[in-house]
Design a protein with these regions (language model features):
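Extended, well-ordered alpha-helical scaffold/bundle regions in very large, multi-domain proteins
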Residues: 1-23
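Catalytic alpha/beta core of large soluble enzyme barrels
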Residues: 5, 12, 25, 30, ...
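Short acidic, low-complexity intrinsically disordered linear motifs used
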Residues: 220-233
Length: 233
């Protein structure tokens, strides 16, 4: 309502007339999706049709890699790429741990240095670590434990409420013509405006790991990749 008040003051954007919004059609209407009754959509619809809106596009979720890190959050709507990884910034390099996972493991009395090293050995995944309850494993899957089809399905669910588009990254361990074509067509059939932002793959070679005990098997901590500066704010 506050946005509508400001829109009334400044007036609608120049090509508002004839747009779907001018006809009372929200993005979810264009997707044939029925929203929850949490909000009074009909009142908002009538007000927009009467007064217009100042901006034709308002929502475009992006990765926000740098800004998310400031508050120790993960990038926007993305799953974690690892439950423990190293982060490189202008201030230096430091280790980041999934704070939500660590809190639950602490609550269960499981978190310790040995478990931390096991997570590093398993490249940030907890799926094959004995002793961790299955409900925690189910909750804290990383992207390499997930089906990309499920990520596209979630993007479809969000899409009905996104007027512009979303920067959706996908992860494939060994990308090839077959799986990339399958993903792109699945996203297209789902109605996504943008089929993919970045395609991420696993590194062919793993670096020597110096953060675990010498007598343990070395493995890599996932490192975050460079992000689009426009999206990182």
């Amino acid at each position: 309502k506050e946005l509508l008040r400001k829109d009334n003051h400044h007036g609608a954007y120049s090509s508002f007339e004839g747009s779907p919004l001018s006809k009372g059609k929200f993005q979810f209407d264009l997707w044939d999706v029925t929203p929850s009754d949490r909000y009074d959509w009909d009142e908002l619809r009538r007000s927009i049709m009467e007064h217009g809106v100042r901006n034709s596009l308002c929502v475009a979720p992006m990765p926000t890699a740098s800004t998310s890190q400031i508050l120790a959050n993960n990038e926007c709507f993305e799953p974690f790429t690892s439950n423990i990884y190293s982060r490189r910034t202008l201030a230096g390099e430091f280790v980041v741990i999934n704070k939500h996972l660590m809190k639950e493991l602490n609550h269960e009395g499981l978190w310790n240095l040995e478990l931390k090293n096991k997570i590093i050995e398993h490249k940030g995944s907890i799926q094959k670590i004995d002793g961790i309850p299955q409900n925690i494993k189910n909750k804290y899957k990383i992207v390499w434990d997930m089906s990309m089809k499920r990520l596209i399905d979630m993007a479809k669910d969000r899409g009905a409420f996104i007027c512009q588009s979303q920067s959706m990254n996908l992860w494939v361990e060994d990308p090839n013509y077959k799986n990339l074509t399958s993903m792109h067509f699945y996203a297209w059939r789902a109605g996504l405006k943008t089929g993919i932002y970045y395609l991420r793959r696993k590194a062919k070679h793993q670096a020597q790991q110096f953060t675990i005990e010498p007598n343990q098997e070395p493995a890599s901590v996932s490192e975050t990749e460079g992000a689009c500066e426009m999206c990182s704010g």
